[in-house]
Amino acid sequence: MATDKELKKIKRHEFKENFAKFYPVEVIKKMGFDRYICKKCGRGFWSTKKREFCGEPTCGDGYTFIGKKIMREIGYKESYDLLVKTFKKWGYKPLKRYPVVSRWYEGHNFVEAGINDFQPFVVSGQVPPPAPAVLEDQFCLRFNDIENVGLTGRHYTGFIMMGQHVFNTPEKYVYFKDEGVQQLVEYFVKTLKLPKDDLILHEDVWVGGGNFGPCIEFFSHGMELGNQVYIQYEQTPEGYRELQTRVIDMGTGAERLVWFSSGEIMSYDVVFPEVMKYLYKQTKIKKNKEVWKKFAQYSAIIDAEEEDVNKAFKEIATKIGIDAVELRREILPTAALYSIADHTRALLVAVHDGELPSNVGGGYNLRNILRRCFSLIDMYQFNIDLNEVIRLHIKEFGRWYKDLKEETVIFDVIKIEKERYLETVSKTKQIIEKMASSGELSNVETLLKLYESNGITPELIKQLRPEIELSSKFYSKLEDLKRPAQKHEGGINVSGIQKTILGFREESNKMSFKAKVIAQIENFLVLDKTYFYPKMGGQDWDLGKIEDIPLKSVQMQDGVVLHELSKSKKFELGQDVSCEIDKERRKQLTITHSAVHIVGAATRKVLGTHINQAGSEKTIDKGKIDITHYKALTFEEFQQIEKVANQMVKKGIEAESKIIPRGEAEKKYGMRIYQGGAVPGKDIRIIAFGNDVQACGGTHVENTKDIKFIKLISSERVKDGVVRIELMVGDKALEKAQENEKILKQVADLWNVSYKEVPKTAERFFEEWKDQRKKVKELTEGLARELIDTKLKTENIAHIKLPVSDFSMLIKIADEAAKEHKEKAILLVGENFAYGISNHSEIDIKKELHKICEKVEGDEKKARGFQLKK
């Protein structure tokens, strides 16, 4: 299939040639607009007054609204309140925002546009919309244009997309192109008092999330105020097809609207007034308003995705008659403050919604922008406390997103990430010094490798070597690399086979049943209905028998359950078969699965609401749950989680299981029900243990008392931002506890002490061992020096074998001895390695090592060898 960029190029030409077919031409004409073709870019556009150019900043004179009051001046949140008030008369329903972490949308880490809230299920028609016509104030994250943030006024990593969405289904038409464009023009012209003569409508194409359609962009004075997309088509491997649900997807950035209405030089001062006041005060930066006003007008041409920012700077400098170096000196420190304001707010919302900085998934982007903040602070030597910046965001932005006022975890996250950043800085200097002279650092591929391997940002390089010109396309390239790959299904071809009815979802206690054979692929049997649980959601498959033939596995492929027989037997299509499920295995898997839910709930109670599930496994031996957390668990936290989990078990919480429409589940319980990731289907199964509610298709106990006992057996930080907890349940948990007690008893008996005295006794033995080890080391070093001194009295090389297993100790002995024997050679041999150093003009120590070692590295003066020859 074509990429988004390729498809957009193809469709842009097609839609322009057939504009009357794809755009609401007649309605636009009735509103007084006429069509023109831009003499510079060639696009079609509509205006109430005759124009030669389309109003794009690159086709005109940049942003011409700065310093002017073009329309009614509005506040940040007021922009959305007025949208709701205007669209209320047409029956639009305002929605509560979705989390910016898009766990419901496979292949996406974050919400990048408001329409993502309804993809893939609503837009594809699989699931009904929350209402036929809705509005939203959705926080979005985008990381492909980080270099532009702080420079253009329109670029943010985190921003509010005010959305107008209409869902036309085959059963019900609501509004589409004609009504949609009229409604938005009324919002701009009547509500916001934007003169109609100042409004320009662009014809364009929108592509995203596998969907596309014509769109109309609303421009005024060089600024795109909104984009109304008419999603009609879905891309397929064969081309494209018309969607069953046709959608209006309009997005307008709240940040852009409030900036445009104010006429201020930069949007960030209007969006973050309290944060910027603090940043200016702490850094004592006073921007030159005359220079900034001129720069801001032409900053519209800056776009790191399309061209080099360095080149754009030179172009702007020429336009406004200022030396490019002087312009950068004036602009960049303030732009750094704007970036810090933007990045910290984006981080705040993302962490609050359940993502953490890390080296994996969406966490990669969060670490990226946080480290950029650290680097900018260091580069310009700013006196900025990021915790105070976050507190101001919570106060300021919390007036709109009130749930942010409860956020506390982010302060811990910043502290830990700062420590990791400082470790990176200490390693960076040496690496950069080696590469600076070669010119490699101007290459974007080199920058990407440095960041991925060592966590080194371009800002950190610039801080250490200001004279080096760096590529401005680093962050856009990094975002391309880190986009999640689409999954491709493999396995057995089940096309044409009807999906299996999953009986266990409603009758999980049924252990024997009859079913019809509807297909057989080698040893894999497909039934019309099954109560065997296939491997999915981290839970192992059931075992048992079909017609007395033991099962080897049970798997599901594209909704079809495949029962793998342990031996070959041919069945007739339509044949009735008797099935028996292994009760004991199912019971153990069931209590393990429920225990994993309970432990997940306990981690949220103990560690905080930032915890999300990042994976799980449920077997008959033990369970595993991976949680999103920014550091390894302390022993006290580990024990507290176990305690809280067992309190829930003891409490006897009844499990609530029901299958309900997806929209109803999301509305009632929120988007955190997707702890196990995206769940397909119009209806989803909800499992609730008290306040812990998840969309889950697994088997579960009826009451937490059925679990009996949960024993946490280990926790480890398996990757950045993810902690794995292993657990055992029921009788197996008791067996594990007894095994641990047996080991403790054996140790106590061995030392002839009580259980309570074991820790102190172990500590005493450890201290004695350390003391003995130190004495042995001192004796070995002393003996080695005597042997070397004695040998070198009569010979030019001291070749000595020592009982040493520590390579660094061997090197230390040889190097210190060589300082005293300046015309001699020393070759020391340890357990399976050797080290030599030569101050003798005729002794090649590397050759000497080759005589006794299989592998040697170094030169004739100093070398080390490995794998002693036998």
Predicted regions located by residue number:
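N-terminal alpha-helical interaction blocks
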Residues: A2-R12
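Cysteine-rich micro-motifs
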Residues: T48-G62
